[in-house]
A protein has these predicted regions:
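Glycine-rich, positively charged active-site loop/lid region within alpha/beta enzyme cores that binds
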Residues: 1-56, 129-145
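A generic structural-conservation signal
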Residues: 6, 66, 109-112
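Conserved short secondary-structure transition element at the edge of the structured enzyme core
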Residues: 9, 39-105
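Short, charged low-complexity intrinsically disordered segments located at boundaries
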Residues: 25, 81-87, 103-105, 126-133, ...
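Intrinsically disordered, low-complexity regions enriched in Ser/Pro/Gly/Gln/His and often acidic
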Residues: 35, 62-64, 113, 127
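Extended hydrophobic/aromatic segments used for targeting, binding, or gating
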Residues: 93-96, 100-134
């Protein structure tokens, strides 16, 4: 068993960049039927952060999807020797194959890695502590603080 599995690496689709700016994005489709996604991912700071990443990716000629998987594989604290893994999913078989293949391109440029760091600094105040989502807000190990 893995020590850590990355689940939902595209942050409910927000990291694909397909939704555009927060002000213009529609909550129709996947977000309408997933109120948990609205609460977790539909935040202005997240959309702004994706724009930071998207601009750096455009300069490199890659997508935010490719950059996200490569960042996770080569620049995060994941460690395959500990059994860490990325749960890769897709709505189509071709997308799944692309998601797997994209990691083979290797590490990202410093400019894209820096964009991820800037994006994180921009939105980290809005990011939940996931362990508290499932054990009660403010809890550690299931017990109230």
């Amino acid at each position: 068993m893995s020590r850590f599995d990355v689940y939902n690496p595209m942050a409910g689709g927000v990291l694909t960049g397909r939704d555009g700016r927060y002000e213009d994005a529609s909550m129709d489709g996947r977000v309408t039927h997933r109120p948990n996604y609205q609460k977790l991912y539909w935040k202005k700071s997240y959309f702004d952060a994706v724009e930071i990443i998207k601009l750096a990716c455009e300069e490199e000629g890659i997508t935010t999807i490719e950059a996200t998987y490569r960042w996770l594989a080569y620049h995060s604290m994941l460690n395959v020797e500990r059994g860490d893994a990325i749960i890769i999913g897709a709505s189509k078989a071709d997308h799944l194959k692309q998601n797997i293949e994209t990691v083979k391109a290797g590490p990202l440029s410093d400019a894209v890695v820096d964009a991820f760091e800037k994006a994180w600094q921009h939105c980290k105040a809005d990011c939940p502590e996931y362990f508290t989502l499932y054990k009660g807000k403010g809890s550690v190990g299931g017990e109230k603080k």
